[in-house]
Structure formats: C-alpha cells, structure tokens
C-alpha cells in the first residue's frame, strides 16, 4: 500500500505521545486526527486505490492507558467493502504498526461519510 499520511494533535511541539509515552498538551489529553490518502493498495483483496479517510481520536490521558474514543470519516465514494477493510486495518486486527498498538486502546463511536479535501504538500498540507 502506498499513499500519504497526515497527523495533527493537540500536544505541544514534539508530541510526547510519540516520543515519551505521555501527552505534553496543556490539559494532559491526547486529541488528534490521523488522515490517509491511499494512492494504491489492497486489503484482503479489496482495492483501496484513491481512498481518503481519517480517524478523529481522543484519549483522556496517555494513549497506552486506554479509554480512547474514535470517529472514522471516509469520503462518500468509499464502498462498504472498503470501509470493512479499513476497519480491519485501523482496529489493529491485521497487525502492523501503529494500529496494532492503537486499535485496542480506543472504542469506535461513529462513522461519517463526508467529503475530505487535501490541499498543499509537505508541511504546508491541510486535511
């Protein structure tokens, strides 16, 4: 699978969750958005070419302490089969980082089909 990933969070510069295990946000929570624009690839025989999706996540404290909540957003053109494949990836049930570690720490509380727009490139990107 190839594509581009985007990650935004409420931590101060140098996300403590990724580097130290604990959020360094002002309120001690971990809130963020992880977005993907899959250029090409498959999961279980399902083509994911062109899929845009995002996980809007929140943990009350450190990620590894659990109790996280997640809402997934997919572009309206995403099929039910693609959504099922993405659910397997993001839940961590297929293995592979980071979702093998993140999936068990959060509960999915919703799925939304909304238009996802990506603008710019590199550090000037918006999602």
Functional labels for PLM-detected ranges:
Residues 32-58:
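Short, intrinsically disordered, low-complexity segments enriched in Ser/Thr and Pro
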Residues 13, 25, 29, 41, ...:
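Generic detector of intrinsically disordered, low-complexity, polar/charged segments
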Residues 1-41:
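N-terminal ordered "arm"
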Residues 50-127:
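Internal, well-folded beta-alpha domain core
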């Amino acid at each position: 699978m190839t594509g581009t990933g985007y990650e935004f969070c409420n931590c101060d510069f140098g996300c403590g969750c990724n580097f130290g295990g604990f959020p360094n946000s002002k309120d001690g929570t971990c809130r963020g958005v992880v977005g993907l624009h899959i250029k090409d690839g498959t999961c279980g025989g399902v083509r994911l070419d062109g899929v845009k999706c995002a996980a809007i996540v929140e943990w009350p404290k450190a990620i590894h302490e659990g109790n996280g909540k997640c809402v997934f957003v997919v572009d309206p053109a995403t099929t039910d089969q693609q959504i099922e494949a993405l659910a397997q990836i993001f839940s961590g049930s297929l293995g592979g980082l980071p979702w093998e570690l993140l999936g068990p720490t959060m509960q999915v509380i919703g799925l939304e089909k909304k238009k996802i727009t990506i603008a710019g490139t590199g550090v000037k990107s918006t999602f």
